[in-house]
C-alpha cells in the first residue's frame, strides 16, 4: 500500500512539474501585441470603398471577382475582433511566406498567451502554415482542426461551407500591402450572412421595438417635434432584458432617424408597420439626435471603437464634401457612443438612471460654443489633423463635459 501511494505521489508530482513546464513554455512574461483598440477613419473609408466596389446587391450568381483588401484594414479588423471577443489584442502583417496573424491574450499572474499563425497563399480555403504558442511550435493542422471545431460549436458550419466553396484563391502582395481574394459570388452568401448577424430572437426584438415606436408616435401630428429624451425614457426603462431589447430599440430608432430601410438588414421588416414621421430633436436640433442615436446603436452593437471611428470619419468627410467639420456633432457622437456602450456593458445601472426625470441636457452637455461648419481648409488651418495637439485638446474638453453628466459616470 505504501509503495502504491509512493508511486501515486511521484506520478502526481510528475504531472504537476510537466504541466508547469508546459505552461511556462506556452505563455510569456511580455505581450506579443501591444496597441490600443482605436480604429482610424482611414479604415472606415477603406471598408466603405471596398463595399461600394463589391456591393453584393449588384453581383450576379456565379460571377468571379477579385477584391484587393489593404493589409492595414485586415490588421485593424484582427485587433478589433481580438479585443471585442477575446479581450486581447491582435495584429496582421504580410511576410515573405504570406500573411501572419498575431494574438495576445492576458492571463492571471501577469502572464500572456501569445499566438502566431502563418497563412500561405492558397487555391481555395487557406490552411494554417507555421504556428507558435509562446515558445511551443504548433502543427498548422492542429489549428485547422481547432478552427473547424469552433465553427461547428458556434453553429455556423453551413455558412462556413458556403464561404469555403465561394473562395477560389488567396494571394499576398508585400509591395502593394494588399491581400487579393478571388471568390465566386453566390446569393446564399448574403442570405446566410444575415442569418448569422441576426438570430431569430433578435429579429423578434426588432419587430417589437418597431411596433413600440409605431405606437409611441401614433397620436402625434406628422412632423411634430419630440425630444429624444422623451423617446428613450418611454421605450427603454420598461424592458425586462434592457441590454438586448435596448439594442433592438436603438437600431430601429437609428434606421428611422437615418431614413434607412430596416429591410436591408431584416427582409421581413418590409411587412412591418412604419412609424409616423416626427421631428426628433436633441438640444433643439434634429441632426444632433441623428448623430447621438446612430452612434449609440453602433456602440451597442459593434463596440465603442467602431462608433468613434465612424463618427470621426463622417465629420472629416463633411469637411471635404458636406456641411463642414462640426465639433458639436462630434460631441453628440461621443455622447451617443457612451450611451450605447453603457447599455451594452452596464444596462441595469443605465436603465435605473433613465427611470427618473430625463431631459436632453442629461444626454448631451452644453456644446453650442464648440466650432462647427469648418471646411477642409479651415480645419487644416486650425487643427491640421485629428492627431494634432489642438484637436486632442478640444476632444479632451468634450470628454470632460461628458464626464460631468451623471448618466455617463
PLM regions and their residue ranges:
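Second-shell loop/turn segments in exported
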Residues: 63-65, 132-133, 279-288, 321-326
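Extracellular/lumenal and peripheral-membrane lipid-interaction modules
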Residues: 2-222, 334
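Alpha-helical transmembrane segments that form the membrane-embedded catalytic/substrate-binding core
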Residues: 291-295, 318-352, 356-363
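Small-polar-interrupted transmembrane alpha-helices in polytopic inner-membrane proteins
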Residues: 303-319
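Primarily interfacial, aromatic-capped hydrophobic alpha-helices that serve as membrane anchors
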Residues: 342-409
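Membrane-interface helix/loop boundary segments of multi-pass membrane proteins
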Residues: 297-303
Amino acid at each position: 500500500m505504501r509503495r502504491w501511494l509512493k508511486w501515486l505521489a511521484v506520478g502526481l508530482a510528475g504531472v504537476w512539474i510537466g504541466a508547469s513546464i508546459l505552461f511556462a513554455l506556452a505563455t510569456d512574461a511580455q505581450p506579443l501585441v501591444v496597441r490600443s483598440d482605436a480604429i482610424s477613419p482611414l479604415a472606415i473609408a477603406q471598408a466603405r470603398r471596398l463595399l461600394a466596389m463589391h456591393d453584393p446587391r449588384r453581383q450576379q450568381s456565379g460571377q468571379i471577382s477579385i477584391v484587393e483588401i489593404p493589409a492595414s484594414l485586415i490588421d485593424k479588423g484582427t485587433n478589433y475582433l481580438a479585443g471585442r471577443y477575446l479581450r486581447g489584442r491582435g495584429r496582421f502583417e504580410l511576410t515573405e511566406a504570406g500573411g501572419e496573424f498575431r494574438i495576445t491574450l492576458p492571463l492571471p499572474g501577469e502572464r500572456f498567451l501569445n499566438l502566431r499563425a502563418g497563412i500561405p497563399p492558397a487555391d481555395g480555403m487557406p490552411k494554417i502554415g507555421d504556428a507558435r504558442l509562446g515558445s511551443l511550435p504548433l502543427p498548422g493542422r492542429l489549428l485547422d482542426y481547432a478552427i473547424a471545431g469552433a465553427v461547428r460549436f458556434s453553429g455556423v458550419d453551413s455558412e462556413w461551407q458556403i464561404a469555403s466553396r465561394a473562395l477560389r484563391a488567396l494571394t499576398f502582395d508585400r509591395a502593394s500591402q494588399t491581400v487579393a481574394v478571388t471568390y465566386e459570388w453566390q446569393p446564399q452568401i448574403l442570405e446566410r450572412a444575415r442569418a448569422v448577424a441576426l438570430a431569430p430572437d433578435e429579429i423578434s426584438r426588432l419587430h417589437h421595438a418597431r411596433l413600440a415606436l409605431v405606437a409611441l408616435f401614433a397620436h402625434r401630428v406628422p412632423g411634430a417635434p419630440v425630444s429624444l429624451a422623451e423617446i428613450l425614457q418611454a421605450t427603454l426603462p420598461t424592458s425586462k432584458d434592457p441590454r438586448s431589447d435596448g439594442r433592438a430599440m436603438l437600431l430601429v430608432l437609428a434606421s428611422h432617424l437615418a431614413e434607412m430601410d430596416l429591410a436591408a438588414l431584416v427582409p421581413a421588416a418590409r411587412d412591418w408597420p412604419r412609424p409616423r414621421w416626427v421631428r426628433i430633436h436633441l438640444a433643439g436640433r434634429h441632426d444632433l439626435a441623428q448623430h447621438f442615436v446612430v452612434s449609440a446603436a453602433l456602440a451597442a452593437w459593434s463596440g465603442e471603437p467602431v462608433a468613434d471611428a465612424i463618427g470621426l470619419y463622417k465629420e472629416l468627410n463633411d469637411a471635404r464634401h458636406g456641411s463642414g467639420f462640426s465639433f458639436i456633432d462630434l460631441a453628440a457622437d461621443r455622447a451617443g457612443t457612451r450611451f450605447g456602450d453603457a447599455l451594452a456593458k452596464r444596462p441595469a445601472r443605465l436603465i435605473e438612471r433613465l427611470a427618473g426625470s430625463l431631459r436632453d441636457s442629461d444626454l448631451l452637455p452644453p456644446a453650442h460654443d464648440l466650432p462647427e461648419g469648418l471646411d477642409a481648409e479651415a480645419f487644416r488651418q486650425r487643427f491640421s489633423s485629428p492627431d494634432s495637439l489642438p484637436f486632442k485638446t478640444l476632444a479632451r474638453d468634450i470628454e470632460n463635459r461628458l464626464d460631468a453628466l451623471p448618466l455617463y459616470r
